[in-house]
Amino acid sequence: NRDLVNYSHDNTRTSVGARLAMYEVGLKTYSPIGQSLEKRAEKIHELEEKEPRLSGALPFVDSHLHNDLIDTLSTRGIPGVALTILAFSAIFIYALRTAKEPYILILLFSLLVVGLSDVILFSKPVPTAVFVTIILLCAYFKVQSDQ
């Protein structure tokens, strides 16, 4: 609660304030076709000079913005967000229509919830492990349904 009060007084150097500042700078500095981390960092520094209240985001400009979709939008642009949504939608539809098993939905829901406040898809090993797990679950349920 204190973090939100600080944020409302333009102090983003708190845990919640920094996250909200990261979300804001990500949305304000994205490029529709994507951009490098260096270009994004440059834009964030320029934005912070104009809006010093966003300084809580500065320690994170070289890594990620603590939200999967905003981080994807800020570096991979609209096509990256569209592909991310398409991938999650395909898994969701498969889980509902074909597998009819809750485990895939639970995994997908967990990824979406955690992705709202942190970045899961940022490093290559994590999404690889997640998608391999989903593929293995799908194969397992297919074998079970064939028996």
Give each language-model segment a name:
Residues S8-R76:
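Long extracytoplasmic/lumenal interhelical loops at the membrane interface
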Residues L27, E42, S74, L83-I85, ...:
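Short, function-defining helix-loop hinge/capping sites that tune catalysis or transport
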Residues H45, E49, F92, T133:
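Short Asp/Glu-rich motifs
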Residues L65-D68, L73-G80, L121-V130:
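Membrane-interface micro-motifs in multi-pass membrane enzymes
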Residues T75-L111:
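Hydrophobic transmembrane alpha-helices and their immediate junctions
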Residues I104-L116, I120-Q147:
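Transmembrane alpha-helices of multi-pass inner-membrane enzymes
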